[in-house]
């Protein structure tokens, strides 16, 4: 015994949703005929193993897409490194989670711009999955 097939109700063609219309409009832009303006270019400097850095964060740390590190803007006072890094001045730092979390806690406790960080990346201990840092934070007297 078989069941009779139900007829599909006849539906009038509906209007396209607004999202689809917006997508079509976006595709019509000719990127070759746009006038581009340079806003900024930047390099992020990584705090490597053995590096010792003293800096004042000028922005809150922002977590990278993978969640394994942070990026923070800072004023660097001193950077001891084997690599070529900025010795003094503004820089964008690529820092590991341990240091990023310490900066977040310091921002919550002291407020942005009210402290200086002294960090030393000691590297990984044998058999460990994480990096060891020596982190000191000093409140700036106002």
Curated annotation (Swiss-Prot):
It comes from the Viruses. Residues 1-31 are annotated as: Disordered. Residues 11-29 have a biased composition (Acidic residues). This is Uncharacterized protein ORF142.
């Amino acid at each position: 015994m078989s069941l009779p097939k139900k007829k599909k109700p006849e539906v009038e063609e509906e209007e396209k949703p607004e999202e689809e219309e917006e997508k079509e409009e976006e595709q019509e832009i000719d990127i070759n005929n746009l006038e581009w303006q340079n806003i900024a270019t930047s390099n992020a400097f990584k705090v490597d193993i053995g590096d010792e850095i003293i800096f004042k964060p000028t922005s809150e740390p922002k977590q990278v897409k993978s969640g394994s590190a942070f990026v923070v803007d800072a004023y660097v006072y001193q950077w001891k490194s084997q690599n070529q890094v900025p010795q003094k001045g503004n820089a964008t730092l690529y820092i590991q989670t341990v240091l990023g979390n310490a900066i977040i806690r310091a921002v919550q406790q002291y407020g942005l711009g009210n402290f200086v960080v002294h960090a030393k990346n000691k590297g990984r201990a044998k058999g460990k999955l994480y990096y060891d840092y020596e982190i000191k934070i000093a409140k700036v007297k106002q």
